[in-house]
A protein has these predicted regions:
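Hydrophobic alpha-helical transmembrane segments of multi-pass inner membrane proteins, especially
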Residues: 1-126, 164-204
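Extracytosolic (periplasmic/ER-lumenal) interhelical loops and adjacent juxtamembrane/interface segments
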Residues: 124-145
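Long extracytoplasmic/lumenal interhelical loops at the membrane interface
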Residues: 138-170, 193-196, 200
Length: 204
């Protein structure tokens, strides 16, 4: 993170935005070559590899996965061959597991997600507190802004675990509404992409 006064931002967020614009432009201009591994797909993968390599220097595996996944679906939308896409998916999933289990802290976070009660006071603490938050919400929630878990119990509740706080404050019904709105947002985005008159706007 880079601090500017009282604010801070992650450089990877800016890189992510620039990469999406670049890929949308490049695929719209040279999309007819996307099925050519050397002249079409290869150069785009090279740019992606450079970007995710820089992000991993931070290191930030979560953003790396998000960036790679976004570009993957852009390649799918641009008409890349299924054989190439399947190969990329296999290599990508294998690469993620290698990155997870070659760093002890990542492996601990992954295993803690599968069984947080194994280490409830350290690696499993955040997951357990998020479950408490969701369970406390019940059907209708405790009320907007009245969460107890966000008062120093659940770390990073405004980013990584915002959904748990939503569940506590709005309850099961409120969470269903939020999920429904997210699906509506996705559907509207897909509809806009499909009906967009130019390839750049559609991919973007």
């Amino acid at each position: 993170w880079i601090g500017i006064g009282s604010a801070s931002f992650a450089p990877s967020e800016m890189i992510k935005l620039c990469l999406i614009f670049f890929m949308a432009f490049s695929l719209s201009e040279y999309g007819d070559k996307i099925n050519d591994l050397l002249k079409g797909l290869g150069p785009h993968l090279g740019v992606l590899g450079l970007v995710v390599g820089l992000i991993m220097l931070q290191p930030d595996l979560g953003t790396t996965i998000a960036v790679a996944g976004t570009v993957y679906f852009m390649l799918l939308a641009a008409g890349a061959r299924w054989g190439h896409l399947v190969g990329l998916a296999v290599v990508g999933v294998a690469g993620v597991f290698v990155l997870i289990f070659t760093e002890e802290y990542r492996a601990q976070r992954f295993t803690a997600f599968l069984n947080p009660w194994k280490d409830p006071l350290d690696t499993g603490f955040q997951t357990i507190q998020s479950l408490y938050a969701l369970g406390s919400g019940g059907l209708f929630g405790v009320g907007l802004g009245r969460s107890h878990q966000k008062m120093f119990y659940l770390p990073e509740q405004h980013t990584d675990f915002i959904f748990s706080i939503l569940g506590e404050e709005l309850g099961y019904l409120g969470v269903l509404v939020v999920i429904g709105l997210l699906f509506l947002f996705i559907w509207r985005g897909l509809r806009t992409a499909i009906t967009c008159p130019d390839a750049f706007g559609s991919l973007l």
